């Protein structure tokens, strides 16, 4: 195992552990540049997820061992560790993203879960796969590999973009193969390895905005992600952040939404 100090970090800063020899995964740089826990969308996603996890009985106050697959520069990891007692290992194949991640309670792993290292199999209580599987042409092998890293009855926590009718230039620019509904997301977990406990949409209020985005952005360009995801001016951002808080509080199960959250458990 190669242990590399992230981005030339000083003593005490996080280490990147290179566990795989897989080629680095490219990703639109604008996406990482816009990632921030302060961005209304990331805050909205976390609020919706925490509400779902509580409803499903996940023990937020216990020190679960969790791994965040495709966790980027650690925005979700930071949010989850701040909101729970969990220790989250950041798993990523984009070295620049790992270098940009700050310290957390867990490890920073340059690791392809398809490698299925023996020392990591069956070691985790839960896996986070937020906005990952839509980037994978064939998600089943990845999901099977993730399952093998979980303990029996371990949780799989997923978020994906919703409603194929909204698929447009933004999705192309972001590297999406598809958007999901509850049925198509559930179908990815067929095969007897998973028991789905809950699926729910969030972001109902964003659906008309994303429909407008699809109509306005006809072709993916180098500016598509930046134009679609911000940064927004202060007034617009505060309005969307308020909308997120209100919708999450009043509408825990939206009939449709811009994203779908899933909680499943390993049952094989």
Predicted regions mapped to residue ranges:
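Conserved catalytic loop of SAM-dependent methyltransferase domains
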Residues: 28-31, 75-76, 198-241, 257-259
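A SAM-dependent methyltransferase catalytic signature shared across enzymes that methylate proteins
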Residues: 186-200
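Conserved N-terminal segment of class I S-adenosyl-L-methionine
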Residues: 1-130, 140-143, 227-234, 247, ...
């Amino acid at each position: 195992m190669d242990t590399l100090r992230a981005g030339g970090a000083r003593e005490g800063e996080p280490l990147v552990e290179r566990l795989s020899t897989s080629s680095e995964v490219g990703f639109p740089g604008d996406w990482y540049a816009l990632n921030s826990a302060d961005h209304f969308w990331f805050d909205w996603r976390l609020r919706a997820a925490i509400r779902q996890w509580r409803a499903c009985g996940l023990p937020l106050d216990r020190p679960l061992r969790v791994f965040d697959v495709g966790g980027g520069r650690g925005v979700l990891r930071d949010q989850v560790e701040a909101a729970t007692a969990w220790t989250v290992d950041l798993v990523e194949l984009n070295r620049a993203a790992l270098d940009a991640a700050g310290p957390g309670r867990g490890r920073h792993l340059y690791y392809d879960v398809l490698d299925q290292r023996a020392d990591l199999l069956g070691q985790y209580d839960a896996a986070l796969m937020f906005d990952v599987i839509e980037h994978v042409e064939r998600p089943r092998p990845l999901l099977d590999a993730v399952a093998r890293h979980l303990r029996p009855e371990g949780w799989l926590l997923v978020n994906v973009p919703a409603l194929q009718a909204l698929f447009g230039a933004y999705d192309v620019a972001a590297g999406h193969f598809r958007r999901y509904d509850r049925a198509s997301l559930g179908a990815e977990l067929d095969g007897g390895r998973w028991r789905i406990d809950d699926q729910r949409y969030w972001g109902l209020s964003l659906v008309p905005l994303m429909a407008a985005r699809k109509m306005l952005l006809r072709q993916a360009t180098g500016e598509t992600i930046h134009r679609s995801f911000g940064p927004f001016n202060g007034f617009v951002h505060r309005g969307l952040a308020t909308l997120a808080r209100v919708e999450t509080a009043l509408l825990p199960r939206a009939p449709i939404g811009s994203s779908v959250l899933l909680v499943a458990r390993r049952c094989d």
